[in-house]
Amino acid sequence: MLSPRRTKFRKQQRGRMRGLAHRGSTLNFGEYALQATEPSWITSRQIEAARRAMTRYIKRGGKIWIRVFPDKPVTMRAAETRMGSGKGSPEYWVAVVKPGRIMFELSGVAEPVAREAMRLAAQKLPIKTKFITRQEEYI
């Protein structure tokens, strides 16, 4: 699963997800893409599950680009721990995804195959997404 090799600080504040994604909102690599329409934290496990669903469907054809990276640590306290005594330890990593963010790109396959692969990937994600093509993007 994806995670940073090293970070400057072990723990981060939660932050807020306001507004639309301005960076990472255009098709850069492939012909087809999966675009987020809701804000959410996407875990590294969810990204990996979506990637596996797509690669299993398209088999050996096509190329997939993952456009989100989980660089935010999520901390958790041990179960049944009293309040106080500091912040919990980092448990997993998430990618902060805002509406408009392109999460996956795909090329080298026909549009019906790409559409179905993206649908399978979208089922693994906790947010609503939409399928876009390079032609639709500039309309």
From Swiss-Prot:
Entry keywords, A to Z: Ribonucleoprotein, Ribosomal protein, RNA-binding, rRNA-binding, tRNA-binding
This protein's record includes keyword Acyltransferase: no
GO terms under cellular component: cytosolic large ribosomal subunit
GO terms under biological process: translation
Role: Binds 23S rRNA and is also seen to make contacts with the A and possibly P site tRNAs.
InterPro entries given in the database record: Ribosomal_uL16 (IPR047873), Ribosomal_uL16_bact-type (IPR000114), Ribosomal_uL16_CS (IPR020798), Ribosomal_uL16_dom (IPR016180), Ribosomal_uL16_sf (IPR036920)
Signal peptide range in chain numbering: none
Originating gene: rplP
Pfam families in the cross-refs: Ribosomal_L16 (PF00252)
Protein name: Large ribosomal subunit protein uL16
GO molecular function, one term: rRNA binding
NCBIfam families: rplP_bact (TIGR01164)
Taxonomic lineage of the native organism: Bacteria, Bacillati, Cyanobacteriota, Cyanophyceae, Oscillatoriophycideae
Oligomer status and interactors: Part of the 50S ribosomal subunit.
Stated family: Belongs to the universal ribosomal protein uL16 family.
